[in-house]
Amino acid sequence: MNIASALIKQVLTVQDFETWSVTHKHYMPAEYHSLYGVIEKHCETFHKMPSIEDLKLEIRDSDTRDKLYAVEAVQVDSEPYMLLEYLKNEYTQKQILDSLEDFIDNSVAFEDAQESVDHLHQIVL
């Protein structure tokens, strides 16, 4: 189960506008960006959360519709706010690992040991 699909399913199922309002597109994996956009547009237009049935009628793009059907099939028992926290943690960890990877790729080969340690301390702080 993907955390993003579980979050979207729960937010739509329980109509949790509060959790959705603090969910950012960049927290989601790229394959969910189009579905996020459709939900966000519906919220801005109608000032309420769409149902899954509403989205089935609104979505014209077949890839986005397929993603919605996949989300609908997910079995979820967790609360939306908890799923959002998990998604934020996953996003943050990925950003940290990407930063460390960039640091290693760009600097380790060109620095001595002390400079590398100093740069790692700067990243941590």
Annotate each PLM feature:
Residues 1-90:
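Noncatalytic partner-interaction/assembly domains of nucleic-acid and motor enzyme complexes
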Residues 73-125:
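Interdomain "pre-motor" coupling segment immediately N-terminal to P-loop NTPase/helicase cores
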